[in-house]
């Protein structure tokens, strides 16, 4: 040690210790100074460092890169070098502090296996067949000291010594036999004698009798007695049996009465418990599965009046009560209280296999009034008897545990293990002393396969129920989310419908305002046709277009107002709109006359065939002829249906004629500039014959021009203006030359609008209840002809 210290003092590079060790070396150097400098108190040179690290091992590992080594002489570190590794390797601070192991050489196990092999097949249930396999019991210090003592005595007696493995094996066999015999004693009359108690009754039906297939079963923990059918036991177990509450290790309180314990069954939720007897006697409660007598259902069906009843026996308002079956008696009591007080509880089996329950109070029970004074003294006595039974059971169990050694015979153990009986007796006496010192508790815990698996089954049931509740919770969460989304969707739909309704009412209001100002019903009020007309490049070229020069029906001449309106219509679109909404320019008598004359065709009389064919009298072969606006007005007034506005299909090279029975003027263009290229053969023919229009006589048949559509249901169709030549008119007057009017329709609509677009506004206008006079009708005809002329 001194040599190491001198080495540390010379060079610090080869030191094997840290700074803490260096302090001790410096102290040792100072100790070599003259004695005159030393103090009187002794220096602690023996103090050693608490930790020692060797750095020479790290230094020996490091070599320069230029050093020549073969690939087999070194290892390559894949991890990066850490700085804390430079600290070194920790070594023990003092070699004398290292504990030295103490070992013993055991003799070879040749003799005992050879002795036990012939009888190894004769071993019992709890013994191990092979010795070298080990034992469940491990020797402790007390066992080791006792083994030394017994070996010394055996040596004095010149007998073979006892080894540790044999001692462990014998103790394990004693514990196994004791556990088996004690379980058998508890289950039989020799142990407690409960099964043969004549006074015990079923906790559900209160019957002391059992029968084949419906045996009386006792719980091994709470000692409750039930019939198989009463508690829903499908198969009687061979070993011990525990009720539902004992299997789960709980002691719940009944939901319907204040009593704890007894034959309880869970509700559907599994969190509340109810006596089976309470479930049977309360009429609103039901049982889900009669075979298993669980779960208890329909607890919520119990009325509030029953929950409010107070028991006349226990004076508590807990749970629910039943009432006396006598018609004039309303005494209430709990079911379990009635059983404990010995009230009369009858179970009557009806003819239709229906069970009726009759319960009576103390007054109406058989012998109730006579036994009423003695009922109170018998209550403590009955409770005392029950307590005495329980106390007796506990005493017998305790006595059985104290006399555990009587359940094991040393000779049986010696025979099963093929050992000397005297040696087994020595171990047996030691086993009794050690177990007594352990408060009669077993030295070995029962095996896992020896534990009743009923509790595990109950745990599995609860686990499956928990999983079921988890899935149910998830399903309910999905349903909640779905309901929320459906509700949000319906709210959005409702808001959209309300918005559409508001838009509809606003449109109706605007339409009513327009109709009140005299807007024509044949004009598209919804604005579709009007907007399309304004979007076109309308070209109007006219020099002298006077309404006075137009031929009139039956030679009648119009008032000068229509002619003035026609001249104003040639200016521009804004003037057209202003005159359309001006109520001052309205003809009076002609429109009234036209309405009066249009009633004749409304009677559906077939007109005679036309005298001649012409371009203006062509009809579409697959379309029915339409009625004039005057017919619509007359029929609408007569209650045949609302007028339907259907604008005619116009082309750029043909102008319509006036209706047959009205006083509207006829537009004729004898001489016109070259028209546009016709789109259809019919239009080409109409253009060719446009300058030579023949007006038929009064008997001319209606032949509409252009695309006509059949009338819609429950509505009277309107005959378009210019659909056929004028009927009932005389020879036409001289007509002045008028230029050709070119009206360019939009290519998308082509001057045609569907029935849905036109008829909806008509229905809205009629629903508005706007009544138009005769002058308004005449003004509408003039405005319509003005639009056609433009």
Swiss-Prot record:
<dbReference type="InterPro" id="IPR019786">
    <property type="entry name" value="Zinc_finger_PHD-type_CS"/>
</dbReference>
<keyword id="KW-0597">Phosphoprotein</keyword>
<dbReference type="GO" id="GO:2000278">
    <property type="term" value="P:regulation of DNA biosynthetic process"/>
</dbReference>
<dbReference type="GO" id="GO:0043997">
    <property type="term" value="F:histone H4K12 acetyltransferase activity"/>
</dbReference>
<dbReference type="Pfam" id="PF13831">
    <property type="entry name" value="PHD_2"/>
</dbReference>
<feature type="region of interest" description="Disordered">
    <location>
        <begin position="1"/>
        <end position="52"/>
    </location>
</feature>
<keyword id="KW-0677">Repeat</keyword>
<dbReference type="GO" id="GO:0051726">
    <property type="term" value="P:regulation of cell cycle"/>
</dbReference>
<feature type="compositionally biased region" description="Low complexity">
    <location>
        <begin position="684"/>
        <end position="693"/>
    </location>
</feature>
<feature type="zinc finger region" description="PHD-type 2">
    <location>
        <begin position="309"/>
        <end position="365"/>
    </location>
</feature>
<keyword id="KW-0808">Transferase</keyword>
<feature type="compositionally biased region" description="Low complexity">
    <location>
        <begin position="9"/>
        <end position="28"/>
    </location>
</feature>
<feature type="modified residue" description="Phosphoserine">
    <location>
        <position position="9"/>
    </location>
</feature>
<feature type="region of interest" description="Disordered">
    <location>
        <begin position="578"/>
        <end position="777"/>
    </location>
</feature>
<feature type="zinc finger region" description="PHD-type 1">
    <location>
        <begin position="199"/>
        <end position="249"/>
    </location>
</feature>
<dbReference type="Pfam" id="PF10513">
    <property type="entry name" value="EPL1"/>
</dbReference>
<keyword id="KW-0862">Zinc</keyword>
<feature type="compositionally biased region" description="Acidic residues">
    <location>
        <begin position="757"/>
        <end position="767"/>
    </location>
</feature>
<feature type="region of interest" description="Disordered">
    <location>
        <begin position="361"/>
        <end position="386"/>
    </location>
</feature>
<dbReference type="GO" id="GO:0043995">
    <property type="term" value="F:histone H4K5 acetyltransferase activity"/>
</dbReference>
<dbReference type="GO" id="GO:0070062">
    <property type="term" value="C:extracellular exosome"/>
</dbReference>
<dbReference type="InterPro" id="IPR013083">
    <property type="entry name" value="Znf_RING/FYVE/PHD"/>
</dbReference>
<keyword id="KW-0863">Zinc-finger</keyword>
<feature type="modified residue" description="N6-acetyllysine">
    <location>
        <position position="32"/>
    </location>
</feature>
<dbReference type="GO" id="GO:0001558">
    <property type="term" value="P:regulation of cell growth"/>
</dbReference>
<dbReference type="InterPro" id="IPR034732">
    <property type="entry name" value="EPHD"/>
</dbReference>
<feature type="modified residue" description="N6-acetyllysine">
    <location>
        <position position="38"/>
    </location>
</feature>
<feature type="region of interest" description="Disordered">
    <location>
        <begin position="111"/>
        <end position="130"/>
    </location>
</feature>
<dbReference type="GO" id="GO:0000123">
    <property type="term" value="C:histone acetyltransferase complex"/>
</dbReference>
<dbReference type="GO" id="GO:0043996">
    <property type="term" value="F:histone H4K8 acetyltransferase activity"/>
</dbReference>
<dbReference type="InterPro" id="IPR050701">
    <property type="entry name" value="Histone_Mod_Regulator"/>
</dbReference>
<feature type="modified residue" description="Phosphoserine">
    <location>
        <position position="117"/>
    </location>
</feature>
<dbReference type="InterPro" id="IPR001965">
    <property type="entry name" value="Znf_PHD"/>
</dbReference>
<dbReference type="GO" id="GO:0006275">
    <property type="term" value="P:regulation of DNA replication"/>
</dbReference>
<dbReference type="GO" id="GO:0006357">
    <property type="term" value="P:regulation of transcription by RNA polymerase II"/>
</dbReference>
<dbReference type="InterPro" id="IPR019542">
    <property type="entry name" value="Enhancer_polycomb-like_N"/>
</dbReference>
<keyword id="KW-0479">Metal-binding</keyword>
<dbReference type="GO" id="GO:0006355">
    <property type="term" value="P:regulation of DNA-templated transcription"/>
</dbReference>
<dbReference type="GO" id="GO:0008270">
    <property type="term" value="F:zinc ion binding"/>
</dbReference>
<feature type="modified residue" description="N6-acetyllysine">
    <location>
        <position position="298"/>
    </location>
</feature>
<comment type="subunit">
    <text>Component of the HBO1 complex composed at least of ING4 or ING5, MYST2/HBO1, MEAF6, and one of JADE1, JADE2 and JADE3. Interacts (via C-terminus) with KDM1A (via AOD/Tower domain).</text>
</comment>
<feature type="compositionally biased region" description="Basic and acidic residues">
    <location>
        <begin position="737"/>
        <end position="747"/>
    </location>
</feature>
């Amino acid at each position: 040690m001194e040599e190491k210290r001198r080495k540390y003092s010379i060079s610090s590079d080869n030191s094997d210790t840290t700074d803490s060790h260096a302090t001790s070396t410096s102290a040792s150097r100072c100790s070599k100074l003259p004695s005159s400098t030393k103090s009187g108190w002794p220096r602690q040179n023996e103090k050693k460092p608490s930790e020692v690290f060797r750095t020479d091992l790290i230094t020996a590992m490091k070599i320069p890169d230029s050093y020549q080594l073969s690939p087999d002489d070194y290892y390559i570190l894949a991890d990066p070098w850490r700085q804390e590794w430079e600290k070194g390797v920790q070594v023990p601070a003092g070699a004398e502090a290292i504990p030295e192991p103490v070992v013993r050489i055991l003799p070879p196990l040749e003799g005992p296996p050879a002795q036990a092999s012939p009888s190894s097949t004769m071993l019992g249930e709890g013994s191990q067949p092979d010795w070298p396999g080990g034992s469940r019991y491990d020797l402790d210090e007390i066992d080791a000291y006792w083994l030394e003592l017994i070996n010394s005595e055996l040596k004095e007696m010149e007998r073979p010594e006892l080894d540790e493995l044999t001692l462990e094996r014998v103790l394990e066999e004693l514990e196994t036999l004791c556990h088996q015999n004690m379980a058998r004693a508890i289950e039989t009359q020799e142990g407690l004698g409960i099964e043969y108690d004549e006074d015990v009754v079923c906790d559900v039906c209160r019957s002391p009798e059992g029968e084949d297939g419906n045996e009386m079963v006792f719980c091994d923990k709470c000692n409750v007695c039930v019939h198989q059918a009463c508690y829903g036991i499908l198969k009687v177990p061979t070993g011990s049996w525990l009720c539902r509450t004992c299997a789960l290790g709980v002691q719940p309180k009944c939901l319907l009465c204040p009593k704890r314990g007894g034959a309880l069954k869970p509700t559907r939720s599994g969190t509340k418990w109810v006596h089976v007897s309470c479930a049977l006697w309360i009429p609103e409660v039901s049982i889900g599965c009669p075979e298993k007598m669980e779960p208890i259902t329909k607890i919520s069906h119990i009325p509030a009046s029953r929950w409010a009843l107070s028991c006349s026996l226990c004076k508590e308002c807990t749970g629910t009560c039943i009432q006396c079956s006598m018609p004039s008696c309303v005494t209430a009591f709990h079911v379990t209280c009635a059983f404990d007080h010995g009230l009369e509880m009858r179970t009557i089996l009806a003819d239709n296999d229906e069970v009726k329950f009759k319960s009576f109070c103390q007054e109406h029970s058989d012998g109730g009034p006579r036994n009423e004074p003695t009922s109170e003294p018998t209550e403590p006595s009955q409770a005392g008897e029950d307590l005495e039974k329980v106390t007796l059971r506990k005493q017998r169990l305790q006595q059985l545990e104290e006399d555990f050694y009587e359940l094991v015979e040393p000779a049986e153990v010696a025979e099963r293990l093929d050992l000397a009986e005297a040696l087994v007796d020595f171990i047996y006496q030691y086993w009794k002393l050690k177990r007594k010192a352990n408060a009669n508790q077993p030295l070995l815990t029962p095996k896992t396969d020896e534990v009743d698996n009923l509790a595990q089954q109950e745990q599995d049931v609860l686990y499956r129920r928990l999983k079921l509740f988890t899935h149910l919770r998830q399903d309910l969460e999905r349903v909640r989310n779905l309901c929320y989304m459906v509700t949000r969707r319906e709210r959005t739909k409702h808001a959209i419908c309300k918005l559409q309704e508001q838009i509809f009412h606003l449109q109706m209001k605007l339409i009513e305002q327009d109709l009140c100002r005299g807007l024509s019903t044949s004009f598209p009020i919804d604005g579709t046709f009007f907007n399309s007309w304004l979007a076109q490049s309308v070209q109007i070229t006219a020099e002298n277009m006077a309404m006075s020069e137009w031929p009139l029906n039956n030679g009648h001449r119009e008032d000068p107002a229509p002619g003035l309106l026609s001249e104003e219509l040639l200016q521009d679109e804004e003037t057209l709109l202003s005159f359309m909404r001006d109520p001052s320019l309205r003809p009076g008598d002609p429109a009234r006359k036209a309405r009066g004359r249009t009633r004749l065709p409304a009677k559906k009389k077939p007109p005679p065939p036309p005298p001649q064919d012409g371009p203006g009298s062509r009809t579409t072969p697959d379309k029915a002829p339409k009625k004039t606006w005057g017919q619509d007005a007359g029929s609408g007034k007569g209650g045949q249906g609302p007028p339907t506005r259907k604008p005619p299909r116009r082309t750029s090279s043909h102008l319509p004629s006036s209706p047959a029975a009205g006083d509207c003027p006829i537009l004729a263009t004898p001489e016109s500039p070259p028209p546009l290229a016709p789109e259809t053969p019919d239009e080409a023919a109409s253009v060719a014959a446009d300058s030579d229009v023949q007006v038929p006589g009064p008997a001319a048949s209606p032949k509409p021009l252009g695309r006509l559509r059949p009338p819609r249901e429950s509505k009277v169709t309107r005959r378009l203006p210019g659909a056929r030549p004028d009927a009932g008119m005389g020879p036409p007057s001289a007509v002045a030359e008028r230029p050709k009017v070119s009206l360019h329709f939009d290519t998308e609509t082509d001057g045609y609008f569907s029935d849905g677009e036109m008829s909806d506004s008509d229905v809205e206008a009629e629903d508005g209840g706007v009544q138009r006079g005769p002058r308004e009708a005449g003004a509408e005809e003039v405005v319509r002809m003005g639009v056609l002329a433009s």
